[in-house]
Curated annotation (Swiss-Prot):
This is tRNA pseudouridine synthase B. Its EC number is 5.4.99.25. One of its GO terms (molecular function) is tRNA pseudouridine(55) synthase activity. GO terms for biological process: mRNA pseudouridine synthesis; tRNA pseudouridine synthesis. The active site is at D92. Keywords: Isomerase, tRNA processing. The lineage of its organism: Bacteria, Pseudomonadati, Pseudomonadota, Alphaproteobacteria, Hyphomicrobiales. InterPro entries: PsdUridine_synth_cat_dom_sf, PsdUridine_synth_N, tRNA_psdUridine_synth_TruB, TruB_C.
Length: 366
């Protein structure tokens, strides 16, 4: 062994209003088997029938403004005809940027992305606090005052490190089984409990004469940038809310990994004519595991792990690491496992049969 340390394809501008059959309406040419939108039309009731397939990997969508994270997942499931998909951390509808979406077996690695750091670039409009802490809400407090750049910079250390943060009223935090935003929409004002979050870095990038300031922040899991703007405004005595927000980094993914929805649509159109594959848009499942060691095993040991059996680690080739590792065989991802007490114990086994990121062809698992 060696150690190597929704039913419609929605366009961004009409996400709230698109009809259920818009995605297929513009395709006139016959579709071949490369087209993930290919539907079997010969159902007994005469209605189109869509076959779902196994797709494994990550797509880092450059989410457009106006689309919810749930809608984005539905769009990609539709586009790939994927059986299973989920996102690795909600991004507000009014925000743009990186929304990592896990397909198939990649959903087993979602916690590794959600626990990673996130980086945002955001703009705060001073002089007004809103109930949603962004431009969508109604004003609840106003001030004619505007902060100076010096006052803002002097405040930033108070919002760096581990701080106590009260989530926005309009947030996905659960209160006795209900989402805070549902209660807020019903007119209920429920006190939210402060909770610790970690902000690794907070920088003032620009400070304009228009009453707005641009920041960059790198923070940990559970941080609300809207709450950050709200709290800075209160301490500066001028109030504030988010008027622009973009996520630029999520765990191992940055802007170079992001793909716009229009580009995915174009790739799908090319696949329909046999000129490409949606596999080109996928990142490997193990991309989410960059921060943990990789352990290569023999095919014999791989067969045991695949059956859920532990493997003894001994001899000079035994790994020197402990804890969680991801296991490969012949360069192919096999499992998440724990190293301890001289054993390699499988925790999550991957079955990568179907469309994967490694090539434009389908591969079989061991």
């Amino acid at each position: 062994m060696t150690v190597t340390t929704p039913d419609a394809l929605l366009a961004p501008h009409d996400v709230q209003h698109a009809g259920a059959d818009e995605s297929a309406a513009q395709i006139r040419k016959p579709r071949d088997n490369n087209d993930p939108r290919n539907a079997n039309r010969g159902g007994g009731n005469g209605k189109p029938r869509r076959d779902k397939r196994d797709v494994h990997g990550w797509v880092v969508l450059d989410k457009p403004i106006g689309m919810t994270s749930t809608q984005a997942v539905a769009v990609l499931k539709r586009l790939f005809s994927a059986k299973r998909a989920g996102h690795a951390g909600t991004l507000d509808p009014l925000a743009s940027g990186g929304l990592p979406i896990a397909m198939g077996e990649a959903t087993k690695t979602v916690p590794f992305v959600m626990d990673g750091r996130k980086r945002y670039r955001f703009t705060v409009a001073w002089g007004e606090e809103r109930d949603t802490d962004d431009t969508e809400g109604r004003a609840v407090a106003t001030s004619p005052d505007r902060p100076t750049a010096e006052a803002i910079r002097a405040l930033l250390p108070r919002f760096t490190g581990v701080i106590e943060q009260v989530p926005p009223q309009y947030s996905a935090v659960k209160i006795q089984g209900e989402r805070a935003y549902d209660l807020a929409r019903d007119g209920e004002v429920v006190p939210l409990v402060p909770r610790p979050v970690e902000i690794h870095e907070l920088t003032l990038v620009e400070h304009g004469d228009d009453g707005r300031s641009v920041f960059e922040a790198e923070c940990g899991k559970g941080t609300y940038v809207r709450a950050l703007a709200r709290d800075m405004g209160r301490l500066l005595g001028c109030y504030g809310h988010i008027c622009a927000l973009r996520r630029t980094v999520v765990g191992p993914f940055d802007e170079s990994d992001m793909i716009p929805l229009e580009e995915l649509q174009a790739l799908c159109d090319r696949a329909a004519s046999g000129e490409g594959s949606l596999a080109d848009a996928l990142l490997p499942v193990e991309t989410a595991l960059d921060d943990i060691p990789a352990l290569a095993v023999t095919r014999a040991d791989a067969a045991r792990l695949h059956r859920g059996q532990a493997v003894l680690l001994r001899g000079r080739d035994a790994p020197h690491c402990s804890g969680t590792v991801y296991v490969t065989v012949a360069g192919r991802l096999l499992a998440l496992a724990e190293v301890g007490n001289g054993e390699l114990i499988p925790k999550r086994v991957f079955n990568l049969t179907g469309l994967t990121a490694s090539s434009a062809v389908r591969k079989e698992s061991i």
